[in-house]
Design a protein with these regions (language model features):
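Secretory targeting and sorting signals
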Residues: 1-27
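A residue-level marker of the well-folded mature domains of exported/periplasmic proteins
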Residues: 2-3, 23-405
Length: 405
């Protein structure tokens, strides 16, 4: 029986949309009255993306104390069901083949740097001989070809796959599984349970719950929130908005959402236009790398800063500190980029690994802001505070120099 992994962290939608995806979004629910056909379509999309069972699951997982080393969140697990991997146990350094969706945004670039530093450690210890990587550049067709290339090459001891999209990538992932070599899927999911382990943080609904609850606690009924979203069709991002919108509606918060394409200029324009219509009390984002542009729109308009949720990207954290606004930095744990390699180490030793490896996902609060700014002092604005690579040999210079392998 197949277990659908697409609900939690995967990409869904047309490749043309995915080319724009940084790491964010879902179909909006509110749109101008003159765009009735679009509004109708988006309402249908919102209904499609909301899943009460998964919402409840992720709501509860936020309060679960993870199991595993306290100082190694990338090895921690939440409610793990373990899988026997004795069939894959063997000695000697292994060659891994990594089919990556892309490194097209700061979040993925930060993770890619961390992954390569972890790889060096495992190469030095004789666990991995090399990791051949192919970058699909946000293309389903390219990633399918990449996986098929690895299979035809016949030279992979194990596969790591960060899928570009869900349904389209499922057959290719299944073909990798059919080789009899271990497959680890991470970040985004597919519609098959053939992988030895599927690794991801708690998920999009958890993000939506954390962020909307924060705004609701700091606003009052009738206040207006502008939700800034990159594009439709990415399920983990769709779920961020679906979860947040549900709670906004229940609290009587007026939430209007806009797709931005991840463009800071467009973000600034959208917020400026909304401010021209009237007061805006809150800003909600499904990814924080355009947060500074949103804040600048308030500054340019001479308006009071909003209550705001961004992300753990340093550009937002620094602007949050500088302005003193009421903020929260949700996190889609970037340290997960280490976990697939460490999972493979366990698999080749024949050790148990979680079938679904759910990693912790906790926002950065105002009380923690100074701590994370200090810990990441000297890092570039595109760096993510909870990257989890402080114990790796290249720290901090490799991340400070933003060396993209």
């Amino acid at each position: 029986m197949k277990r659908s992994l697409s609900i939690t962290v995967s990409l869904v939608g047309a490749t043309s949309l995915l080319l724009l995806a940084g790491c964010t979004t879902d179909p909006s629910v509110e749109s101008p009255a003159e765009e009735t056909p679009v509004e109708s379509s988006e309402e249908a999309g919102a209904t499609e993306w909301f899943d009460q069972e998964l919402f409840d699951k992720q709501f509860d997982e936020r309060s679960v104390v993870p199991e595993g080393p306290e100082d190694k969140p990338y090895l921690q697990t939440i409610n793990a069901e373990m899988k026997d991997t004795a069939e894959f146990a063997s000695e000697g350094a292994k060659k891994l083949c990594f089919a990556n969706a892309s490194i097209s945004n700061p979040w993925r670039q930060t993770g890619w740097i961390t992954m390569n530093e972890q790889l060096k450690v495992l190469q030095d210890s004789g666990v991995i001989s090399e990791m051949e990587t192919r970058d699909a550049k946000d293309s389903d067709d390219t990633q399918i070809a990449d996986i098929d290339y690895f299979i035809a090459e016949g030279n992979c001891d194990g596969f790591i796959i960060s899928p570009n999209s869900t349904a389209a990538m499922t057959p290719a992932v299944e073909r990798a599984c059919d080789t009899g070599k271990p497959v680890v899927v991470f970040d985004r999911g597919v519609e098959t349970d053939c992988a030895v382990s599927f690794i991801h943080p708690i998920g999009g609904f958890a993000w939506g719950i954390d962020t909307s609850e924060f705004l609701i606690e700091n606003l009052k009924k009738g206040d207006k929130v502008v939700a800034l979203r990159i594009l439709p069709g990415v399920d983990v991002l769709e779920q961020r908005w679906a979860g947040a919108e549900k709670l906004f509606d229940e609290a009587g918060i007026e939430a209007v959402d806009h797709f931005t394409g991840g463009d800071p200029a467009e973000i600034k324009k959208i917020v400026s236009d909304e401010l021209a219509k009237g007061d805006v009390q809150g800003i909600w984002m499904d990814a924080g790398d355009g947060a500074v542009a949103a804040i600048e729109a308030f500054e340019d308009a001479g308006k009071a800063y909003p209550v705001m949720t961004g992300e753990d990207e340093l550009s937002f954290l620094r602007k949050w500190k500088d302005t003193g606004l009421t903020g929260l930095a949700p996190v889609y744990s970037n340290f997960q980029w280490r976990t697939p390699l460490l999972a493979m180490e366990k698999i080749f030793k024949g050790e148990e690994v979680p079938v679904e490896w759910v990693l912790p996902q906790s926002p950065i609060t105002a009380e923690e802001l100074d701590e994370y700014l200090e810990r990441n002092d000297g890092m570039p604005d595109g760096h993510y505070a909870k990257f989890g690579g402080e114990d790796l040999p290249g720290y901090p210079k490799v991340w400070q120099d933003r060396v993209i392998p």
